[in-house]
């Protein structure tokens, strides 16, 4: 287990040694609260776009299902006839310059794994830049849009926003409830009181003050050929190597278990890069991975490498709330 994995386990499962980090946590909280106050008070300016901006983000470190939820929002808005764009930091990307327009034919090293996954799945106009206002301005210079989704960026207060949606893993919650480095929170838990909606990944029903959504496996996609097969392509009891380089790899492994496959887990750090030699696992079995990992492995994939396609399925109550908010924002 790597240091980052041990730290995540301590944050979410508890460890007495974390008490030693509380002085640093207190400093982190003061800085985070002060920075937000600077923008809310107007002491520091925020860029206000000429169209609605919806931020989809996390308050915790670790995966929450954000990318599938963004893909759902893209398709849902398009079904209403809306022109949607996306901006992202492009974590881990090394583009020739910024801002950088992500296109499907690029590779993950250039575009970032999550932005490339979004573009390949949806074809949405997407611009990456650590400077979110600059990314948005560049996107608007190229596209006529009705609204923009900001992938992450909850803490990027230089970008004014019209709606804040925060995703939380229902099983892990807020961990020990403490801020970095003593816990997994990027901002104090009180920050959740000011967001527009909380979405709980994996909740069985809408919790008090929030909405449930789940990730629904839909198909197996072959990395080499692009062939789409039903989940029944792997029968119950099928043994596979399972690769997950995401913020919460155990959720992926649990999904495979729920599908009655016998997975040999191989967890890697979030946004990890791979080589064919690293993934030559023994014994020789089909390799099953996340879609996010697949965008980094397609160039050297073997014939029996597959990814599990999943779709976000939000609760009907959230869909109704989201539609009402869209109508309000677009009428202004």
From Swiss-Prot:
Keywords: ATP-binding, Kinase, Lipid A biosynthesis, Lipid biosynthesis, Lipid metabolism, Nucleotide-binding, Transferase. It is an enzyme of class 2 (transferase). GO terms for cellular component: plasma membrane. ATP binds at residues 60-67. It comes from the Bacteria. It catalyses: a lipid A disaccharide + ATP = a lipid IVA + ADP + H(+). GO terms for molecular function: ATP binding; tetraacyldisaccharide 4'-kinase activity. GO terms for biological process: lipid A biosynthetic process; lipopolysaccharide core region biosynthetic process. Pathway: Glycolipid biosynthesis; lipid IV(A) biosynthesis; lipid IV(A) from (3R)-3-hydroxytetradecanoyl-[acyl-carrier-protein] and UDP-N-acetyl-alpha-D-glucosamine: step 6/6. Its EC number is 2.7.1.130. This is Tetraacyldisaccharide 4'-kinase. It comes from Pseudomonas aeruginosa (strain ATCC 15692 / DSM 22644 / CIP 104116 / JCM 14847 / LMG 12228 / 1C / PRS 101 / PAO1).
